[in-house]
Amino acid sequence: MAILSDKTIKEYLEEGKIVIDPLKDEQQIQPSSVDMRLGDEFKVFKVIRKPYIDPKDEEDIAEYMESSTVPEGEAFIIHPNEFALATTQEYVKVPDDLVARVEGRSSMGRLGVTMHVTAGYVDPGFEGRITLEISNIGAMPVALYPGQRVCQLVFETMTTPAELPYGHPKRNSKYMKQLKPESSRVKLDYELKK
């Protein structure tokens, strides 16, 4: 696997092989990645009277979360030990012969804010806004602003195009074409349906 350079990223964007929309300015394209901006919708867990979340539970996990939209110019405050779901402003299409990785920007990491807990991998064929699993592991609350560059997308080549890319009818592509933060759909995983 090879990581795409800024030159190749620009070529693929011009050809439409990679789609990042909107790409507000060329400064988002870094030497080997593309800076992604924070969207304006967030989901956080509600305080509920339940001892734990069971992925096999028929109750929808979405019921344990509440959504909010942050108006332009205002901030979403993430407190220490808090977790929130958000998305990038940009809608992304990854071709069948590339994968992408979400990496936090070091400027955010130095504040104690991570942009993905475990799902930093974007499959070939994915299309939609990238989900961010934001955590504050620092000691102070941090203000996050919609439109702020918070992470970067790194593209890597594959040895061959995927035979069954994300979104293929034979795949269980639970988050294809998502536009806003989506709660976990883990209960749809085939091994939990048995």
From Swiss-Prot:
It comes from the Archaea. Its EC number is 3.5.4.30. The keyword tRNA-binding does not apply. The active site is at residue 133. The record marks 120-121 as: Important for bifunctional activity. One of its GO terms (biological process) is dUTP biosynthetic process. Gene3D superfamilies: 2.70.40.10. InterPro entries: dCTP_deaminase, dUTPase-like_sf, dUTPase_trimeric. Keywords: Hydrolase, Nucleotide metabolism, Nucleotide-binding. The keyword Nucleotide-binding applies. SUPFAM superfamilies: dUTPase-like. Pathway: Pyrimidine metabolism; dUMP biosynthesis; dUMP from dCTP: step 1/1. DCTP binds at residues 105-110, 123, 131-133, 152, 166, 174, 178. It catalyses: dCTP + 2 H2O = dUMP + NH4(+) + diphosphate. One of its GO terms (molecular function) is nucleotide binding. Belongs to the dCTP deaminase family. This is dCTP deaminase, dUMP-forming. The gene is dcd.
